[in-house]
Curated annotation (Swiss-Prot):
The lineage of its organism: Bacteria, Pseudomonadati, Pseudomonadota, Gammaproteobacteria, Enterobacterales. PROSITE patterns: RIBOSOMAL_S19 (PS00323). This is Small ribosomal subunit protein uS19. It comes from Wigglesworthia glossinidia brevipalpis. Keywords: Ribonucleoprotein, Ribosomal protein, RNA-binding, rRNA-binding. InterPro entries: Ribosomal_uS19 (IPR002222), Ribosomal_uS19_bac-type (IPR005732), Ribosomal_uS19_CS (IPR020934), Ribosomal_uS19_SF (IPR023575). Pfam families: Ribosomal_S19. SUPFAM superfamilies: Ribosomal protein S19. PANTHER family: RIBOSOMAL PROTEIN S19P FAMILY MEMBER (PTHR11880), SMALL RIBOSOMAL SUBUNIT PROTEIN US19M (PTHR11880:SF8). The gene is rpsS. Belongs to the universal ribosomal protein uS19 family.
């Protein structure tokens, strides 16, 4: 179920504070975050944010088509290694 419109989009305060600091200084700095639940705002466009997938931080470059989505949508948490191969040998 989507979030109520009267509540507005969610972003963690510590992440918002880091984004505002980088916007003021104008530096290109990588932001590391564990907040996969935060919504991508238009202020984040052009930044690189490193999002934790449970094992390591994966950097993602924020584009304009990502606005409104969550950070966790772009970093998969599970790796698919494929199904086990069929090991039967055919006899001729």
């Amino acid at each position: 179920m989507p979030r109520s419109l009267k509540k507005g989009p969610f972003i963690d305060f510590h992440l918002l504070k880091k984004i505002e600091e980088i916007k003021q200084t104008g530096k290109k700095k990588l932001i590391r975050t564990w907040s996969r639940r935060s919504t991508i705002f238009p202020d984040m466009i052009g930044m690189t944010i490193s999002v934790h997938n449970g094992k390591q931080h994966i950097p993602i470059f924020i584009g304009d088509e990502m606005v409104g989505h969550k950070l966790g949508e772009f970093v998969p948490t599970r790796t698919y290694r494929g199904h086990s191969a069929d090991k039967k040998i055919k006899k001729r």
